[in-house]
C-alpha cells in the first residue's frame, strides 16, 4: 500500500510539473505582439496607469500587463479605456494579428489614426479622445468588425466608401466629429447594421442609402441632410432626425411620457408611422399636466433655439476667419479643384478646438502680415553625429548603398545589431530656406505611417549636418531587380509584379489622398521602390520633395537622373502635381510589364523611350503579348495582362486632367488581383501568343 501511495504521489508530482511547465511556456507572448505593445506604450508617453507595461522586454501575457488579455501566446484584447492616458497610437498596431478587441476610449489620445489598424478586430472603440484626420482606408479590409465607435473626436473629411466588405458590422458610431460630405454608398451593403449614430457632424445629401438596412436605432440629428426620410425607415424603433432640412418631417403624435432609455444626442422623435409605447401606458395624463408639458417644452425649445443661433453665428464668423488664414498657408501646387478642396478641409479643421498636446501645424499671422508656421513636434528619434559615424564606419565608401539628388545613402550597423539606412544630405543641394525648413520637413516625414512607405526613424542636425535615419530594407530595389542580369528578375513572377504595383499604388494613394495637405512625391521611380524578403514594396524618399529647390532651373537639375519618368507637363513648364506622380507610376508599371528601362540608349532609336514605344501597342492584343518581359516565360494570365495594360494607358495619358486619382488606380488593381489566376501561356513560331490553352496547362496560384 505504501509503495502504491508513493507511486501515486510520484505520478501526481509529474502531472503538476507538466502542467506548470505548460503554463510557463504558454505565458511567453508572441514577439511581434510584444514589440507592438512596446511601441504603443512609448507612443502613449509610458504612462504610470499602465501597470507592468515596459518599454523594452517583458511578457505581457505572463506578467499581467494592465488591460491585456491573451489566449496562449497571442494578445486578443487591449482595454485601456478611461485611464487618462495621452499621446498617440504608434505605428505597429497592425502587427497585432490576433487582436479582436481594442478599446482606448475615454482618454486624451491625439494625432491622426494609424493608417494600418489590427486587421482582425471584431470590436474597435476609439471614442472620446482627441483624434484628428480622417478614417484610414485600411478599415475597408477589417471585415470581421461587429462594433466600431469613433465618436467624440475631431475626425474630418468624408467618411469614405469603406464598408463594402463589412458583413458582420452591427453597431457603428461616428457621432460628434466633423465629418462632411454624403453618407458612403457602401453603407447600403452592410446587411447586419442595427445601430447607427452619425449625429453632430457636417454631413450632407440624403439618407436614402440607409433605407434597406435592418436598423433598430438611427440618429442623424444636427447635420445638413435634406430630401425625404425614406418610408422604409418607419419600422425603426428609435429614430432621431431633427437639426436637418428634411422635406417630410412627420407630425408628432399626442404627448407622452418619455421612456427610461436615452439615446446619445439629439432630441428623441417618435418613429415614423407608429407611436412609441410608454412603460406606463395604462396611466393617463390629466389635461393640466399635458398643458404644462406643452408650454414647458415650448419654453425650453425657445431657449435652445436662441443658444443654437448664437453658437452658429459665432461659428460662421470663426470659419470665415480661419478660411482666410488657411488659404494663405496652402501650397500653390495642384489644380484649382484640389486647392479648393484643401481650403474647405483646412477651414473645417481650423475651427476645431485642439488640446495643447496635439501635434498640429498652425499658421500665425504676424503684425507685418507675414505668416510664421509653428512646427509640429517631431516623433522621430534624434541621433548624434558621432553615433552615426561609428555605425557607418565614418561614412566609408564600402557602406554606400545608394545615391540620389540630395546625397548618398549609407548602410549603418549600430552596436545593438540594428541595421539602418542613413541618408546624408548634401547641404550644397539646399538653399538657405531649405536648411531652415529641414526640421519642419523632418516633422512631417516622421508622421508618415504606411506599410508600403519606408518609415523615417530618426534625424541629426549636429554641426550643420543634415542626416536622415530610415528603417533598412535589405533586398535591393525594383530597378536593380528588373534590369540586372541575375537570378533576381527570375523571382519576380507576374503575381509579384502586380503585388509591387498595388503596394506602391497604395503608398501614393496615402500621400495624395490621406495626408492633408497632399504630399507630392516628385521622384517616384523604380530605384526608389525597395523590396523586402517577401517582395513587398516600400517607397523611399517620401516627403523629401519639400527639401528640393522650387525654381524650374533647380528642379530640372534635381531630377535629371530621373529623365524618362518625367510627365509631359513638367518637361514643358516645370509644373509638378499629384497627377505627375500618377504618370510616373504608369511608367513604373510599364517597367514591370516589359522589363525594360524608361530610357535605353542601347536599343534602336524607335525603342529608346519606353513610353513612346509602348503606348501605341497597349490596346493591341498581339503586340501586347510581344511586349511582355521574356523572363516571365509565358507565365501570366491573358486577361490580367490586358487589364494591367489598360491601367497603364490611363496613367500615362499626356493630359494630366485625364489621369485617374490614385484611389481609382488602387481599386482597379485590387479588382485585377481578385480575378487573377496564373495560366501558363505558350508561344510558338507558328501561332504566336496563345490566349487559349488546354485545360491541363492551367496552374491555380492566384493571389
UniProtKB/Swiss-Prot annotation:
InterPro entries: Kinase-like_dom_sf, Leu-rich_rpt, LRR_dom_sf, LRR_N_plant-typ, PRK1-6/SRF4-like, Prot_kinase_dom, Ser-Thr/Tyr_kinase_cat_dom. PROSITE patterns: PROTEIN_KINASE_DOM. The gene is SRF8. Expressed in seedlings, roots, stems, leaves, flowers and siliques. It is found in: Membrane. Disruption phenotype: No visible phenotype. The lineage of its organism: Eukaryota, Viridiplantae, Streptophyta, Embryophyta, Tracheophyta. GO terms for cellular component: plasma membrane. Residues 28-291 are extracellular. Glycans are attached at residues 120, 130, 149, 178, 226. CDD domains: STKc_IRAK. The chain crosses the membrane at residues 292-312. It holds the Pfam family LRR_1. This is Protein STRUBBELIG-RECEPTOR FAMILY 8. One of its GO terms (molecular function) is protein kinase activity. The protein kinase domain is predicted to be catalytically inactive.
